[in-house]
Amino acid sequence: MISRPESSLSGLESSQEVQKKTWNPRNYSARLTENIGLPLILLEKHNPWPAYVAYISPAVTRITEKGWARDLEYIYAAEKNGKPVKRSKHSAVLLKRRKPSKPSELMLKETLSETMLPTWECSTIYVSPTFVPEPAQLQMDVREGPTSNYNKIIFSKRPAMRKLPFGLLQASKEMHTKD
């Protein structure tokens, strides 16, 4: 840092005032954020999208809803047969699924989801054969969500090397050597 006499600042802040305004990490150690340790004053100036995206596409939501409906169906079938249900092992649920026998069960299987039934009570499924829960609203409706083009998964791939014919390569080398 270049030291200047106080008189040369003429209207500008003194060096002591400038040093007080500079950021010192020792002063902000108690106010660090949980994520990567940035001070809060830096995060307040710029609030970008989070590093992870909490957006779930409708196709993925439908797949998970169908999976949960199948799991609930398996639990109901296991209770009906008198077998104990092991909720801790998800792989056992995936391996032992049965086809629905009634059309109403098929309809319910596609419409029920984890958000609709927070507990594993199977008695709520068969309260009414026409029971169709409303689809859950996406969390992104509340805040400005990503557009369909903004958050696409892009897999990195090494670009293909361009192969020039040997004659063109030699001609380009000769042009560069003549200059």
From Swiss-Prot:
<protein>
    <recommendedName>
        <fullName>CMT1A duplicated region transcript 4 protein homolog</fullName>
    </recommendedName>
</protein>
<dbReference type="Pfam" id="PF15213">
    <property type="entry name" value="CDRT4"/>
</dbReference>
<dbReference type="InterPro" id="IPR029185">
    <property type="entry name" value="CDRT4"/>
</dbReference>
<feature type="region of interest" description="Disordered">
    <location>
        <begin position="1"/>
        <end position="20"/>
    </location>
</feature>
<feature type="compositionally biased region" description="Low complexity">
    <location>
        <begin position="1"/>
        <end position="15"/>
    </location>
</feature>
